[in-house]
Each structure stands twice: as structure tokens, then as C-alpha cells.
Amino acid sequence: MTQPSARFTLITAARLLDGTGAAAVEQAALLIDGDRVADLGRASHVHVADGASVERRDYGAATILPGLVDAHTHLVAPGDGTLGDDVAREDDDILLLQAAKNARTLLHSGVTTLRENGAKGKVAFSLREGVRRQLAPGPRMVICGRPIAITGGHMGYFGSEADGEAAVRAEVRKLLKEGADYIKIVASGGSTRTSDPNRASYTVAELAAMTDEAHRHGKLTAAHCTSAQSVQNCLDADVDMVIHCIFNEPDGTYRFRPDLVARLAAARAWVNPTLYVMKAGIERQREVREREGRLTPELTAQLDAARRALDVRVDAVRRMSEAGVRMTAGSDSPWGWYAPGEFVHEIHMLAQAGLSYADAVVAGTAGAAESIGVGTLAGRLARGRPADALVVRGDPTRDITALWDVLDVYQAGRRVERGVA
């Protein structure tokens, strides 16, 4: 859980990143008053009133930055290669325990805010409430509750299948009544056995009905898109975020679409490319199957083809970014083979796709927070804002892998007890 603190906590380090991409403040200090940032800047300019109760922590050559914001998680999954179809067969009580375990793991890794992109039944709602009541440790949660899918579509097994304009609009209203913070739409097929990832699922009219209803209530929309037609449909329907953004044709071939990229940039839509979930599936499946003696020539060929497809996707993200498309960091973990607590892998992949280390850090802090609608609450260190902070050894703007070396995590001004000496 979290450790109680004096009214003021003063932490100092070699540098501070505020999450916006501004130059680092050298010889920095962050002053916390309760659950808020009271002051920040050069240590010589940050002062505590005489006689005030203050706890001081000096981290030497480390970096202070905002708590990370993972814009895409599925907390009910174990991250061990279990298919979503099989995850959905578990009892909700077991899934809630799995989700609580994953939430704690993410918090300990430095993620202080997350967007939950689809769970079964009431699991996400229950976990969010449990974290709010401090019954279980976890990041601030932005949830959709359940993704809306066509009958037999990807993730329909989580409990929100709807078809037709009236039915999908009603499903949006139902989820908002239950307490959804945003609406997740499955605009194409995916890994679900009864779906086709290369084809669009919803029509433009159905997508527009969901987006209109969400926007009428002041809520954002995000859509899973693994086909070019689904991306085009979502642009036509004014969806706020395109997830995966894969330009596959119905026959499974990939063709980069400069026309759609230009529209994404012009619309200021966010793209969450989810690169590492694919890399994790390639690397970890190869490792596990080889250890089990089940790495067949056929599977090896499939994994080699997947690696080539990943290279194409990395290049596509680079080209989209160069065209002005806004990129947000969201892991998609612990889906598939992507283990929980490893969000840094996705941030690193964005850097490999052409973002500077500094911009990749922004994509996982202030940028991610803005993309999921909590830009005033998370992802940035500033006076008066929630004191969610991360301290890492080294400088992630020079070496992004420094984000792995977590010294401490602060949530609402309190140091998270991670069981680390």
C-alpha cells in the first residue's frame, strides 16, 4: 500500500522532467503538500516555511518525472499467452483477483494512471471502486467497463454485443449508466476466434451513433482497428482514438495508406499503435515453445513472418509520426504474451519507431494523459496538480531504459510501499 507521510515531503534529484517535453530542471526539487504538488524547480528556489513538518528524501543522480500513464491495458488477462476467448471463460471473481494483482504490479512499476480497455462483466467497475476505497493498491483508472462489439465480434465475449444503430446507442447509454468513463468500440475483428481482423465490423452509421451518444455525454471514444476499412470508417464517424491502426486489406495484405494518415493528422485523432504486444508474442512464444521442445518449422515460419510484419508496422508508425499524427503510449498488456508491469517496453518501441527519447517519455506521461481525457489530473508535474511521481536512476531522455530502474513511486503524495529495500 502507501506509507503515511509528514504534511510536506521534499524530494530532490539531479533533474526533473515535468512530462511536457520541456527541458529538464537540473539540481531539482519537488515539494509535496498532502496529495498535491506545492512547488517544483531548482532545489535552491524551492523552500519550506520555517517550522513546517517536512520529510526530506534525496535521490542523488536520479530523475524525478510524472507517474507513467498507460493508455491501454486489459487487467483481466494474465499475460502468459492465454487467448482472450479462454480468459472470458473464467469466473468473474477469479478475473477480479487477476485484475487486482495486475493493477498492483503496474503501480509498482511506475504506472500511476491507466486506461482499462475492456474487461468482462462488472470486473473493471468493481476494481476501480476497490482502488478508490483503498481496498487494493492500484493506479488511477479510466475505464470503459466492456468494449462494444458486433455479435460474434472481437471481445464480444466480455458482455456488450450490440448490432444496429439503435442497439449500439442503447449499449453506450447502458455503459454510461454503469459508470463508464469512455466508450471502447471494436471496429474490426481481432484475435477472437469468431472474428476476422482484416475486415471492418461496424458500419459508419453504427460507429457514428456510438460516437454521437458518447460525445453528447462528454465522453471520449476509442476504437480497435486492425483493417484499413475500419480506420476509414472511424475517421468518417469522428472517433477520438484509433487503436492499433493497422492498414490491412481484406485478404490480409498490408498497404500503407497516406490518405488515411493525412486524415488522422488533420482530425487530430490519437493513434495508439501497440507495437510491443506483437513483439512480445513473437519473442516469448518462441522462447516458451523452444523450451518445451514444441518449436516446429511451421511455427518458426509463422513467427518469422510476424517479425517481418512488425518491422512494417514500426516503419508505418514512424511515417505517421512524421506526418503529424499524434501518438500515445498504451501497452495493451497483459493481453496475449505481454506481461504486466512492462509498459516501458511500449515506450521504448515508440522510440525505435522514430520518436526521440524525450518525446517517447511525453507519449507515456502528459501525452497519454491528454489522449485519455485526464490531462488535468495526470502525466504532468505542476503546482497544484496531483502529486503522482516516479523516481528513476539515470536520465531517460538520454537512455530510455532508465525507466526500468525505478527507485520510488509516489501516488497522491505518498510513497508507494513496493516491498523493495
Model-assigned labels for residue ranges:
Residues R216, R294-P396, R415:
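His/Asp/Glu-enriched, well-ordered alpha-helical/loop segment
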Residues A62-R133, H154, A205, T226-A237, ...:
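Metal-associated gating/positioning segment near the N- to mid-region
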Residues M1-L10, L16, T20-L65, D85-D86, ...:
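Histidine-rich, glycine-flanked metal-binding segment
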Residues V76-G79, N117-V123, A149-I150, G189-R193, ...:
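Active-site environment of divalent metal-dependent phosphoester hydrolases
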Residues Q98-A124, G138-A149, A180-R193, K219-L220, ...:
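Divalent metal-dependent hydrolysis catalytic cores, especially in the metallo-beta-lactamase
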